[in-house]
Regions:
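C-terminal extensions
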Residues: 52-55, 59-82, 87-88, 171, ...
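C-terminal beta-sandwich/jelly-roll accessory domains of carbohydrate-active enzymes
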Residues: 220-272
Length: 272
């Protein structure tokens, strides 16, 4: 139980207490962002349907608080995806996908979560490497490439970063701002399933089909093999698309029906 007790949110007086207590804190500090991090599960429920009553109480609390503080960004917490909830997105537009922020582990998490929830609701951050949970060492590029397809952010100790890493982060933030509208309003396509192959790829296409973002990842380096071809989806077959990194131009028809082989580095955990 993590030394935690659960408040009975099925009771109106408890909900009012929480609303008043949280509102008092938010009203007396310069707060622009708040994350609700709830890890304790419900056990020994007193009656059938109690979990539903509890959820309605939680919605009541968040409805009151967000109405009082419309300029604060609230983020939910998932504990591995279990608390992603379409209803709570009315109050918290983004949810922390998992405390496991390792970029390679996140491939499957974000791929799966995106089947039910929009890209802009999936909190995905660049965190320190080696990862604090699994010890995996991934490049700053790989961590950012995976995190772009979500809310994007950084969670690491900047005092331990080199000047070169700071410059790389500046470039990443500049790029993220370019694709921000695309991630919020574009259409997502899952191209390569990481559960079935050594690769993962997804794509976001703007509504007018003029702009696309594609991420492709090779999980493990394998000797004497060609990378899996990536075939895009949802493009205009009559349009020409320019790769902003290489300058190469491809037709939408070519990208969808012929596809391209990603130019991965010869190492594990490589992204393009």
């Amino acid at each position: 139980s993590r030394n935690q007790m659960v408040l009975d949110l099925s009771r109106d007086e408890v909900c009012e207490y929480v609303i008043n207590a949280v509102s008092d804190i938010l009203a007396n500090a310069n707060i622009g962002y708040a994350k609700r991090d709830m890890i304790r599960q419900l056990t020994d429920m007193p009656r059938l349907g109690y979990n539903h009553e509890y959820t309605l109480g939680y919605y009541k609390i968040m409805s009151a608080i967000t109405e009082k503080f419309p300029n604060i960004l609230f983020e939910g917490c998932s504990a591995g995806g279990g608390r992603f909830d379409a209803g709570v997105l009315a109050y918290m537009p983004q949810i922390w996908t998992s405390d496991n922020s390792d970029a390679i582990a996140r491939l499957k998490m974000q791929y799966s979560t995106s089947m039910c929830y929009p890209v802009y609701s999936i909190s995905s951050h660049v965190t320190a490497s080696p990862n604090h949970q699994c010890g995996r060492d991934t490049s700053l590029k790989t961590r950012a490439d995976v995190a772009y397809c979500g809310t994007f952010g950084y969670e690491l100790d900047v005092t331990k970063m080199s000047d070169e890493e700071f410059e790389e982060i500046k470039a990443q933030i500049k790029f993220e701002k370019r694709i921000q509208d695309l991630m919020c309003n574009g259409d997502l396509y899952r191209l390569i399933n990481p559960y079935e192959t050594n690769y993962c790829s997804w794509e976001v296409v703007s509504k007018d089909k003029k702009h696309i973002f594609v991420m492709a990842c090779k999980v493990l380096a394998v000797a004497q093999t060609k990378s899996e071809k990536v075939k895009l989806q949802g493009l205009d077959t009559n349009k020409q698309y320019r790769n902003t990194f290489t300058g190469k131009v491809y037709s939408g028809d070519f990208l969808m029906y012929h596809g391209i082989r990603a130019n991965y580095e010869m190492k594990d955990f490589s992204t393009v």
